[in-house]
Amino acid sequence: MTKDISKNESVVFDVQGLNLWYGEDQALKNIKMQIKKNKVTAIIGPSGCGKSTFIKTLNRMIENIPSVKTTGEIIYQGQNIFAKSVRVEELRTKVGMVFQKPNPFPKSIFANVVYGPRIHGIKDKKLLMDIAETSLRNAALWDEVKDRLHDNAYGLSGGQQQRLCIARCLAVQPDVILMDEPTSALDPIATYKIEELMESLKKHYTIAIVTHSMQQAARISDDTAFFLMGDLIEFDKTTEIFSNPKDKRTEDYITGRIG
């Protein structure tokens, strides 16, 4: 069961009848949901349910796999993202991605953050430094690295590397941040810092996060979507999903009876 929870709230993604196949295997089945502006939407479900596939479809990153084919629409900024007129590079700038494992480039901390702006033609050193500082501040990392910006990013801890990847994403001024299990490789303290950061970031960005942790979804998200075997079983406000699920399969999953 999916509920329309978008009344009086701005919709960033309107997903309409989305189907996706890997070759002959269907991974997403007639997905219909809306992701709201300046909210955190959690995508939950057991391994292989389609949640990572879904989130990677929102900026068409899934198309890097040759066998993928899709039907349906994802409306973003009034346009179907699958339309031929959509430039994928621009879409991925506006809809950034943070992955499960921190993936800094083998460059300095500074060079990591300004990599995107440089690709987009920004060369002015002062402007690049301003972008780096702003992005690192917004990723809650500036105070920890401001005196070693030209050190190799590999010298950072895992949690710091993940926040650096978030800063790198922010540097190109996205509207949306997609996160695919961003804390699964981190310790509890680093996880807490990322979760605290998400609460701050949603004031300016829309966030969708895939997580295996029910506790994390309950803590950080405003809305939650439960996927099972490629189907969207239930989508509602997080408080409703965890306190009053409408579908027994949702209840069974969040209470540990399936998954």
UniProtKB/Swiss-Prot annotation:
Amino-acid positions noted as binding ATP in the UniProt annotation, renumbered to this chain: G45, P46, S47, G48, C49, G50, K51, S52
Family matches, as SUPFAM superfamilies: P-loop containing nucleoside triphosphate hydrolases (SSF52540)
EC number: 7.3.2.1
Bilayer topology term: Peripheral membrane protein
Reactions it catalyzes: phosphate(out) + ATP + H2O = ADP + 2 phosphate(in) + H(+)
Protein task: Part of the ABC transporter complex PstSACB involved in phosphate import. Responsible for energy coupling to the transport system.
Protein name per Swiss-Prot or TrEMBL: Phosphate import ATP-binding protein PstB
Gene name as annotated: pstB
